[in-house]
Amino acid sequence: MKKIVFTGGGSAGHVTPNLAIIPYLKEDNWDISYIGSHQGIEKTIIEKEDILYYSIASGKLRRYFDLKNIKDPFLVMKGVMDAYVRIRKLKPDVIFSKGGFVSVPVVIGGWLNRVPVLLHESDMTPGLANKIALRFASKIFVTFEEAAKHLPKEKVIYTGSPVREEVLKGNREKALAFLGFSRKKPVITIMGGSLGAKKINETVREALPELLRKYQIVHLCGRGNLDDSLQNKEGYRQFEYVHGELPDILAITDFVISRAGSNAIFEFLTLQKPMLLIPLSKFASRGDQILNAESFERQGYASVLYEEDVTVNSLIKHVEELSHNNEAYKTALKKYNGKEAIQTIIHHISEA
């Protein structure tokens, strides 16, 4: 029986692509383990999936000054030793890393044990963790074809993004019942990320009188961001977040308004949903969402509205443009084959 160790964490985006791949490896009888941090989100997610989970020490990798930068290198070193010992006991055939600060000790621990290491990078340019890990890896899979120019040619493989199978199996009838919507108006689903997005939430709510004339709205507004005054608004349903219902909601969705995190937008792409993307500004991030959004716009998958340009009028204008050019967006979206990503990655895992 072949063995694999997965790693990746710090945010859900560094875990969910692993969850897309794991079921296929289970079908092929791989022995699967996961190494992550003691208290990261990856621990909560993976333990629900009935996968052996091992914790190691980890320190955050920062690009800015913080007093914790003095302590964290020692935590990383401790994490490398933890990972080295654990990997030596597990004896995997390959390690697959999705990035995030916890992945660096695991990658180095694997390299020290002479285990082949494969990386996956979701964004247009590699994050700090993958930049460090790359020197210890044999291959790096990229989600965006343009990302290849930032990486060593001999290591890079373009795959697209692995998308969880359950996301593709939504039921429209269940969504209609859950939301209390009719079939008469198109549905817009608005997502601002797990914590929400204050400016998006406020602008959407200001624009509701105009939007609800033509559309029904599902608003995933983030923890603590519900507006009690809108709870019984006809054609408008708001949630802090949804879990099992999300595939059904996406099945009934005609257009998506969203941030431009790579994993989410590739799920929308695979589902062929035209998008209005409002990326995190470069002042609130390293600018990766802007690059992601602009790539999708160039390929005809999405329209981009920059956060500093978000107003009620600009939001309504962009929604109307999506609706007016719906067929053109659909034609572009059909060109993408999302199923190839998982099969390509599994092939290289098996060959490692």
Curated annotation (Swiss-Prot):
Reactions this protein catalyses: di-trans,octa-cis-undecaprenyl diphospho-N-acetyl-alpha-D-muramoyl-L-alanyl-D-glutamyl-meso-2,6-diaminopimeloyl-D-alanyl-D-alanine + UDP-N-acetyl-alpha-D-glucosamine = di-trans,octa-cis-undecaprenyl diphospho-[N-acetyl-alpha-D-glucosaminyl-(1->4)]-N-acetyl-alpha-D-muramoyl-L-alanyl-D-glutamyl-meso-2,6-diaminopimeloyl-D-alanyl-D-alanine + UDP + H(+)
Keywords: Cell cycle, Cell division, Cell membrane, Cell shape, Cell wall biogenesis/degradation, Glycosyltransferase, Membrane, Peptidoglycan synthesis, Transferase
A GO MF term: UDP-N-acetyl-D-glucosamine:N-acetylmuramoyl-L-alanyl-D-glutamyl-meso-2,6-diaminopimelyl-D-alanyl-D-alanine-diphosphoundecaprenol 4-beta-N-acetylglucosaminlytransferase activity
InterPro entries associated with the record: GlcNAc_MurG, Glyco_trans_28_C, GlycoTrans_28_N
GO terms under cellular component: plasma membrane
Cited SUPFAM superfamilies: UDP-Glycosyltransferase/glycogen phosphorylase
Compartment annotation: Cell membrane
Residues noted as binding UDP-N-acetyl-alpha-D-glucosamine in the record, renumbered to the chain: S11, A12, G13, R164, S194, Q289
Pfam families membership: Glyco_tran_28_C, Glyco_transf_28
GO biological process terms on file: carbohydrate metabolic process; cell division; cell wall organization; lipid glycosylation; peptidoglycan biosynthetic process; regulation of cell shape
Primary residence: membrane
Pathway: Cell wall biogenesis; peptidoglycan biosynthesis
CDD domains named in the record: GT28_MurG
Topology relative to the membrane: Peripheral membrane protein
Documented EC number(s): 2.4.1.227
Function, in words: Cell wall formation. Catalyzes the transfer of a GlcNAc subunit on undecaprenyl-pyrophosphoryl-MurNAc-pentapeptide (lipid intermediate I) to form undecaprenyl-pyrophosphoryl-MurNAc-(pentapeptide)GlcNAc (lipid intermediate II).
Family: Belongs to the glycosyltransferase 28 family. MurG subfamily.
HAMAP family, alphabetized: MurG
Record's protein name: UDP-N-acetylglucosamine--N-acetylmuramyl-(pentapeptide) pyrophosphoryl-undecaprenol N-acetylglucosamine transferase 2
Species assigned in the record: Bacillus cereus (strain ZK / E33L)
